Amino acid sequence: MAIAIIAEYNPFHNGHIYQLEYTKKNFPNDKIYIILSGNFTQRGEISLADFKTKSKIALKYGADFIIKLPFEYATQAAHIFAKGAIKIVNQHKIDKIIFGSESNDVENLYKLANLWNQNQEAYNAFLKYALKLGYSFPKASAFALEEISGQKIVFPNDILGFEYIKQIVANNYPIRAYTLKRSEEFSLKNPEPNIASATYLRQLVNENKSISRFSPMKFIHPVCSLANLYPEFQKIVRETSPENLAKIWLISEGIENLFKKHINEPNFEKFLNAVNSRRYTNSRIKRAMVYILFRIEDPSQFDEEKIQLDCWKNQGF
């Protein structure tokens, strides 16, 4: 018997420690597997800590086994991220997963996943319609689900959890999902006494502020950041033709021309703001930037272990 947690640990923090302790307490007969992203994340960010460090700290705080989520899944949109992660869970004959959820209503997520599975033709028609209107894929997916179910999934952990359960239902995997209540107050503006979101902690780290109240991890500047690689990204985009940019994975729908148009923006944040639109979310843009920076045409053939950034030396626990 085993239970899986699908994680990025960017960075590992007290909320993750609580999840491991909760899982060990409530599933005492199960080995805990972490399906863990490597050095890059689903939102297109460079992980603050490398895979090896994240693995060590997870094992220290209660995980039994670490399985790496391949780059080709770890740096994709939520539905592809979930597809890869749940496929790995099934391959390793792990019969349970547990994830944080704002609603903590796993039965409703199953209900919606079954409704989606039984109405894929209608769902796909609504999805296609929304994409034609210029919606981003996440917004189009939410629109299509609401059209067939009358419900919106609005919280980020519920959205990702729904994607996990969709994969379980669609593939009839012998896996049962469980949830751990995660407060919607668990945010940038409302950190709890000793627990804060990874987003908030990344902000503190980037501002060179201590996160010791919220995490056992320590970081020294300069830390890993896509913003620090923006000059290199500018150089590549300026020197590469649109035709050759379009050969890179995720560079489609003319996004290469949009990048060319705004490549003289003076910094990463201004570039993001210039390129961001209803169709292209920040995460979609950042994922594309990662693929351009490392000239990745086929993510299944990309060995991220060959990328060694000095900033990964500036972290530990």
UniProtKB/Swiss-Prot annotation:
Subcellular location: Cytoplasm
GO terms, biological process: tRNA modification
Residues reported to bind ATP: 6-19, 100, 157, 182
The enzyme's E.C. designation: 6.3.4.-
This protein's UniProt keywords: ATP-binding, Cytoplasm, Ligase, Nucleotide-binding, RNA-binding, tRNA processing, tRNA-binding
Catalytic activity: cytidine(34) in elongator tRNA(Met) + acetate + ATP = N(4)-acetylcytidine(34) in elongator tRNA(Met) + AMP + diphosphate
GO cellular component: cytoplasm
Gene Ontology MF terms: ATP binding; ligase activity, forming carbon-nitrogen bonds; tRNA binding
InterPro entries: Rossmann-like_a/b/a_fold, tRNA(Met)_cyd_acetate_ligase
Predominant location: cytoplasm
Pfam families assigned to the protein according to its UniProt record, in alphabetical order: HIGH_NTase1 (PF05636)
Family: Belongs to the TmcAL family.
Function description: Catalyzes the formation of N(4)-acetylcytidine (ac(4)C) at the wobble position of elongator tRNA(Met), using acetate and ATP as substrates. First activates an acetate ion to form acetyladenylate (Ac-AMP) and then transfers the acetyl group to tRNA to form ac(4)C34.
The name this protein goes by in its record: tRNA(Met) cytidine acetate ligase
